[in-house]
Amino acid sequence: MEERPERLISEDGLRLDGRKPDEMRPLKIQAGVLKRADGSAYLELGANKIVAAVYGPRELHPRHKQKPDRAVVRFRYNMAPFSVDERKRPGPDRRSIEISKLSKEALEPAIFTEYYPRTAIDIFVEVLQADAGTRCAGISAASVALADAGIEMRDLVAACAAGKVEGKVVLDPMYYEDGYGEADVPLAMMPKEGKITLLQMDGDMTPGEFKQAVKLAKKGCKIVYKEQRRALKEKYGGD
């Protein structure tokens, strides 16, 4: 981690990148970026650059792993060795394995897995450039890739984090805020249904601050959801 800046929030309430506490970083999503995948998406959030690919539903081998009444969803989150400044060993580490598990659990409630018995739906998320918030960005990109693959879903899953920085609750923490902030609250939800599929808290917050963080993260999810829908509409037209 680079040296901590003197102040993360200025006296006039602005953050290092000029945002107000309740503002998100610039967000851009594109659907259908990989020809060989059944579904794919590219997402930029601030300096984050993420690609998601979906393969399936396809027959699951070995057969003893098949579920007779539903599809098995598998998720692999990976940070490219060149995605961060410090040297990263190739292959999954403990953090990547944990994020893969949580991301799968965040997305699975949205998928009609019962429509695809005895199959596997494989989701791969590759972080090409990391700038905090890659877990939420990966879930949001993967959701668009699932829709692009034509997989039946109850709703898209949109994800966004809030955090606590120098005593203030902020939306979508960036690199320094994530590294030097007091708390982080990633949240994923199906906005149409209002159902939360992932909610974590890492750090120290009062109950009031936590409530405020959840409210802010939900606001962020609605912004993400709008961009997810725009990306799919741009590719496919319609609603």
Curated annotation (Swiss-Prot):
UniProt cross-references to HAMAP family, sorted A to Z: Exosome_Rrp41
GO MF: 3'-5'-RNA exonuclease activity; RNA binding
Subcellular location: Cytoplasm
Similarity annotation: Belongs to the RNase PH family. Rrp41 subfamily.
GO CC terms in record: cytoplasmic exosome (RNase complex)
Keyword tags: Cytoplasm, Exonuclease, Exosome, Hydrolase, Nuclease
The EC number(s) this enzyme carries: 3.1.13.-
Any single GO BP term: rRNA catabolic process
Spans annotated as Disordered: 1-21
NCBIfam families, alphabetized: ECX1
Top EC class, one word: hydrolase
Main location, first listed in the record: cytoplasm
CDD domains according to UniProt: RNase_PH_archRRP41
Identification of the protein by name: Exosome complex component Rrp41
Function: Catalytic component of the exosome, which is a complex involved in RNA degradation. Has 3'->5' exoribonuclease activity. Can also synthesize heteromeric RNA-tails.
Record note on quaternary structure: Component of the archaeal exosome complex. Forms a hexameric ring-like arrangement composed of 3 Rrp41-Rrp42 heterodimers. The hexameric ring associates with a trimer of Rrp4 and/or Csl4 subunits.
